[in-house]
């Protein structure tokens, strides 16, 4: 099992699949029961239209689910196709509830 200290994760870069920096980690969302990391809380550029459609906290940081993230030695890489699917599913659910 690979281990890493929290302070080495905070401020780590988040890049897209082409290696372009899209933001940085500012916090984590952890399941209290299992201890699993559920999402990264990230500070991103306002120009990141796709990522800005994800859930945000009161400071404008976004929650990126771990299901769309690959971890490399020095950064977190997001899969924008998976993010689009999450956003599409959320829109579909909202329409059905209306």
Predicted regions, residues:
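Peripheral interaction segments used for macromolecular assembly
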Residues: 1-98
């Amino acid at each position: 099992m690979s281990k890493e200290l929290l302070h080495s994760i905070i401020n780590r870069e988040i890049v897209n699949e082409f290696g372009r920096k899209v933001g940085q980690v500012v916090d984590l969302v952890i399941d209290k029961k299992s201890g699993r990391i559920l999402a990264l809380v990230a500070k991103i550029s306002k120009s990141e239209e796709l990522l800005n459609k994800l859930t945000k906290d009161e400071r404008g940081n976004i929650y990126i689910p771990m299901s769309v993230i690959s971890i490399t030695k020095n950064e977190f890489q997001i899969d924008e196709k998976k993010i689009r699917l999450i956003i599409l599913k959320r829109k579909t659910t909202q329409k059905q509830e209306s």
